[in-house]
Swiss-Prot record:
InterPro entries: Ig-like_dom, Ig-like_dom_sf, Ig-like_fold, Ig_V-set, TRG_var/const_region. The lineage of its organism: Eukaryota, Metazoa, Chordata, Craniata, Vertebrata. Gene3D superfamilies: Immunoglobulins. It is found in: Cell membrane. Keywords: Adaptive immunity, Cell membrane, Disulfide bond, Glycoprotein, Immunity, Immunoglobulin domain, Innate immunity, Membrane, Receptor, Signal, T cell receptor. V region of the variable domain of T cell receptor (TR) gamma chain that participates in the antigen recognition. Gamma-delta TRs recognize a variety of self and foreign non-peptide antigens frequently expressed at the epithelial boundaries between the host and external environment, including endogenous lipids presented by MH-like protein CD1D and phosphoantigens presented by butyrophilin-like molecule BTN3A1. Upon antigen recognition induces rapid, innate-like immune responses involved in pathogen clearance and tissue repair. Residues 1-17 form the signal peptide. It comes from the Eukaryota. One of its GO terms (biological process) is innate immune response. Gamma-delta TR is a heterodimer composed of a gamma and delta chain; disulfide-linked. The gamma-delta TR is associated with the transmembrane signaling CD3 coreceptor proteins following the stoichiometry: a single gamma-delta TR heterodimer associates with one CD3D-CD3E heterodimer, one CD3G-CD3E heterodimer and one CD247 homodimer forming a stable octameric structure. Upon activation, gamma-delta TR complex associates with FCER1G to initiate intracellular signaling. Residues 18-118 form the Ig-like domain. GO terms for cellular component: external side of plasma membrane; T cell receptor complex. This is T cell receptor gamma variable 4. Disulfide bonds join C41-C113.
Length: 118
């Protein structure tokens, strides 16, 4: 059984935060259940701080999955997120990749990345 993960990289900026611009691209990914998918967040030159990944599914509020702390090079998962399901790597100050493992149909949705200094 195949299904699509719709991936949209968009810039999200809370009004109270100093924000950085993101270069976004829209990408649809189709993978089989049980496989993995990788999506890339393209960052504006000189982006630092925290890079957040969100999942938005139809009829639900966006859910933050994790964030990458570029100051300590660490990944912080949101409460309730299974370790090993998501991971990030490749922060080169130009992009950050997130891998989704052991895909299930419920992983389908729109994924967003956002960055700001905190």
């Amino acid at each position: 059984m195949q299904w699509a993960l719709a991936v949209l990289l968009a810039f999200l900026s809370p009004a109270s935060q100093k924000s950085s611009n993101l270069e976004g691209r829209t990408k649809s990914v189709i993978r089989q259940t049980g496989s993995s998918a990788e999506i890339t967040c393209d960052l504006a030159e000189g982006s630092t701080g925290y890079i957040h990944w969100y999942l938005h599914q139809e009829g639900k509020a966006p859910q933050r999955l994790l964030y990458y702390d570029s100051y300590t090079s660490s990944v912080v998962l949101e409460s309730g997120i299974s370790p090993g399901k998501y991971d990030t790597y490749g922060s080169t100050r130009k992009n950050l990749r997130m891998i989704l493992r052991n895909l299930i149909e419920n992983d389908s949705g729109v994924y967003y990345c956002a960055t700001w200094d905190g």
